[in-house]
Amino acid sequence: MTLEEMKKHEWSVSWSGGKDSTATIILMHEHGVPIKEIVYVRMMYDDTLPATLPVMTDFVDSAIKVFEIWGYNVKVVKSIKTAEQIINCVYKRSKYPERNGKCYGVRGFARGFCKFTDVKKNTIKSLLNGEYEMIGYASDEVERLHRLTDKKCSIMAVLGIAKQDTFDICRKYNLLSPLYELGVKRDGCWFCPNAGKNEREMLKEEHPELVEKIHDMIEVCDYDISSFGARNNWVADYFKENDVLNV
């Protein structure tokens, strides 16, 4: 689909706050491609506390105000399930008998098996099914471009915008996520076991109240989790002075 053809439709944009989806909105704004609505799924730890890092939550809220000033409808939708609900799920038929009858706890977010990832996908799917959707695929993401269809398009691909270009596009409007400048390589949940050392140190220094919730997520397991998080010492890092891996 050409740029002129895109202008004949109204598009929904699933926005994450990251540079690719933000650049997509900016380019649509600059080139006059109609935006029906911008959808942001707010992943939630519980009914009131967002799962995103606080600095990211603040950025998202400020960016939403910019989009609304531009005249766009921004729909903020809470995730259809909270992290707390996953934490409190109980094992019933685990291949590890010692876990049955006990809470998922932090293991509900294990690498490759994170149950929260599907929650986000399903929330987005429930909102955008059948809509004309603008996707934040850059022109050099060749492994993704084949997924585009007549109703799922990328303005970046049409304009030849590469991933590296999105940084300057976002900076132009002061809409680049602060995570890039902070050296946080992923826009994930503050309790995610994939969190790198920089992110964990920032959380411990600035948000000890969230670290306490991570302690609770680990302790609620009530079974041996010594094999969990070995790659980046995630569990051990939060309990340097306490041996609770085998609780």
Regions found by a protein language model. Name each.
Residues 7-10, 176-178, 185-247:
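ATP/NTP-dependent adenylation/nucleotidyl-transfer catalytic domains that generate, transfer
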